[in-house]
Amino acid sequence: MSHQYYNPTTTRLQRSELAVPGSSPKMFEKALNSNADYIFLDLEDAVSPNDKISARENIIKALNEINWREKGKTISVRINSLDTHYMYRDVVDIMEQVGNKVDTILVPKVGTSSDVYMVDCLLTQIENQKKLKNKVGIECLIETALGMSNIKEIAQSSNRLE
């Protein structure tokens, strides 16, 4: 029998989760004062196409102005799917401007390990260029049959996975 060893991932308190649309800044303070341990600021499903860019700007502003960690919150940003033209700017703008204030990037519609690899490479390049001390984790949403059929490879694709 063969065994494969994995580096342990970061463990974060996640008893309750709250999704907050990036297009609704008034909801940021409510999320901050909620009992949720884990908050994901959403750039994907909860945001209409016309609001994608302003939602990204709202999230960057909120991460700069609000001390989420002081309230014990784990902060994730759900980026747009890799097959959209928003995804690249989501990762680059968030990481370059507030990468030190983000715990994880939530990647939707992951279908293969190469999807994770792409995000991992972007994060690594930005973290190195910006000299960020903490590595941002990656969380994957498996939402398709393709993702389910590749689940083992996806689960082994990065030591950033949480």
PLM ranges: what are they?
Residues 1-2:
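N-terminal mitochondrial targeting presequence
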Residues 8-162:
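Conserved alpha/beta-domain cores
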